[in-house]
Amino acid sequence: MKRRPPKKREVAPPIVAVEGSLAEPLPGWAPAVLVGGATLVMLAWTWGRWPDLLIDFSRDLYTAVQLAHGRVLYRDIAFFTGPLSPYLNAIWLRIFGTSLHALVGLNLIILGGFLWLLYRLLREIGSRLAATVSCLVFVTTFALAHLVPMGNYNFICPYSHDMVHGFVLGIGAIYALARYTESLSTRMAWAAGIQLGLVQLTRAEISLPVLLACACGLVAMILRDPRVRSLRSSLALRVVAPAAAIPLLVFLLMACFMPWATAFRGVLGSWVWVFDPVVGTMAIYRESMGLDDLSGNLGRILAWAAIYTGVLLPPLVFALRTRSNQRGRGAVLVLLAGLAAVIMAVGWRHTAPADLARPLPFVAAVIGAMTIFALAKDGGGEPARAALTVRLMLSVLAFSLLGKMLLNARFHHYGFILAVPATMLAVLGLVDFIPGWIAKRGGSAGAFRWASVAVLAGLVAIFLQLSATCLARKTTPVGEGGNTFIADSRGEQVNAVVGFLAREVPGDKSLAVVPEGTMINILSGRTNPAYCTNLMPPELATLGETNVLGDLERTPPDVLVVDLDRIGPQGLRFRKEVYATRIAAWILAHYELVARFESPPTHPMRIRLGIMRYQGGAPSAVDPASPS
């Protein structure tokens, strides 16, 4: 049977068919120059200051290094998300060397590829200008921003590589389905299915939104596009088969090296946490989602929605009342918006920047609802349906990702991934969707468009200043060779600890850091013999304190580096929570404090580290957390 030739790709961006005619002010070369230039500037500015010294990121680096040296994930070393990211990183490190710089190189490549992918996806539903502005916001506010003092929440040294890899694969799957709606290419269907299979090997909070988004897209294609409807069986096979087969094949492969139950839990990844009632009720996750202060967070969402409405409504009315040929009045609007942006950039410390993302769930829901309504009308032909289907998938992804912080949406922290799709939709709305609606009514779309760009520039200026404030704290060089980076002042104590270990502890002695901080293992070149290398509440809740303690008793590390502010006779401490009472008691009973390294009491990033040596059954002579 002769195959149908692929349909020629539409030259005009689909948004033109959906929202009305808009001018394209940027030449074809501008996006690459602007986005590429901004990325290079941000990289140069933040270079070497991406990771946090002790928290989160080093867990992924240490795990990948251990896998590269032959240990087996889940069997020899505990891990609580899917196997894709650890093994991808381990393969790369096995080839290019087990160092921080090698992993940074991989992440730079992923970031470059993702920028291309994000731009192409946004061009499926938006103009060149809107896609370019969106990518600029992404680079400066998410990918390379430094919005909290610790670092971690960026695409180069992320707190969790599973978040980045899963998100990239999710956007890739949506883009593949977008291309399928245009060309009915079987390769694009297979590409979507393969990426859906891989994304399930990352994290539940990423894989579930991606699956929901793609499922909604497939349903919309089948219901609204006669071409796809006639091919629905083959489409379902090509998408669903690899999405189901890849996790199954990985499970069977892992089962060759460990018990089946262990392999199954490994493939489930963080789904184990999703259904764990103890983890789900932890204060950190309730606070992240906004459930700790329900009425207060709802009030903040409404307040910020009202603020944004108050900011955007006057220029919207002004643009509607201004004809497109009244350039003078349009210029006045743009100048006023520019003035507002300058005021925002200068007075940002009085705007509670941590709350600026609060209305994002509302934005994603409204755009999604309007997209469903437009699809139900079934107007505009194939290009319009294709664009609306892509917009629907992006809207579902945006709203679903925000579920982890639904009442506490933010650009920082988890928001460096979870808030990206909703923010991209908001930018498209300001630069394309609303101006297109204005143009259809004869108003000055260009004036509102450039006014929106000015306001967005003001928001970006706020976050650049936040990044500058946080980056200014990082002035202490840490590490040697391929593991060098620049840390905050805690690096002075870490350098002292690493130096002490090199001088006083034989190189074959094992080391654990309590409760977290495997970067010290990396910097000192020492292995943690324990199965669980991160003694934080979620890990202990999943494995059970009894099991973790039993493993420590069987293979006690020769030396501990302990955060003295987070251990005492009552247990380990995390924020206001006290946990792991028996583990803390065992440490105090079997380890002796031999050295301590402390920041001055008045230091803003104060840390107190102690080195403890294993003494068998001999109890520690002092409470290590007591003042020296």
What is the role of each PLM region?
Residues 48-63, 72-91, 98-102, 258-260, ...:
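Extracytoplasmic catalytic/substrate-binding loops of multi-pass membrane glycan-assembly enzymes
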Residues 208, 354-370, 383, 388-392, ...:
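Hydrophobic/aromatic-rich transmembrane helices and adjacent perimembrane loops
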